Amino acid sequence: MQERINNCVTQVLAESAGTRGEGAYLIDIKVKGKGSGRKIEILMDADDGIRIHQCAYISRRVRERIEGDDDLLELVGENFDLMVSSPGLGEPIIIPRQYIRHVGKLLQVTYADSNGDPVELVGHLQEVSLLDEHGAKIVIMPEQKKKKGQQPKTEAVILYLNQVIRAIPEAEL
């Protein structure tokens, strides 16, 4: 069923050029519950941040497709709930494309060092390269606390995404 819903969302996104849904991309789909009370949660984003009108547009189009497909509607149940939303602050980055919208922002990153041990890093995302010859990578400028009378010494940290265990956007005060 999840694959069928995924196909449904993919079709809606493919047809969204020039519409209110343009620019949005799929992050994740979760189907919860059983029988006629299922809840479908669709997580979306856009490179410049998804807007409410984009979520509403996609929600309407996906609902129309599900309700127009008798087989899928039977699987989902007629009383299904559909929620289309964006990842909230503090939610981990799931797919590489999400890094693009967080350039310049503070991230809390856990990555595996050369020994495979987890390392925590908090810093500003400086650069994203999804098409590097060695694999997708990010560049983080670590945040360092200033010591009185001294300039902090910082060097950018380059991480390939296969090293990243978890990355969470942080609020800046």
Swiss-Prot record:
One of its GO terms (cellular component) is cytoplasm. Belongs to the RimP family. This is Ribosome maturation factor RimP. Keywords: Cytoplasm, Ribosome biogenesis. One of its GO terms (biological process) is ribosomal small subunit biogenesis. Required for maturation of 30S ribosomal subunits. Its main location: cytoplasm. Signal peptide: none annotated. It comes from Pelodictyon phaeoclathratiforme (strain DSM 5477 / BU-1). Transmembrane segments: none annotated. It is found in: Cytoplasm. Gene3D superfamilies: RimP-like superfamily, N-terminal.
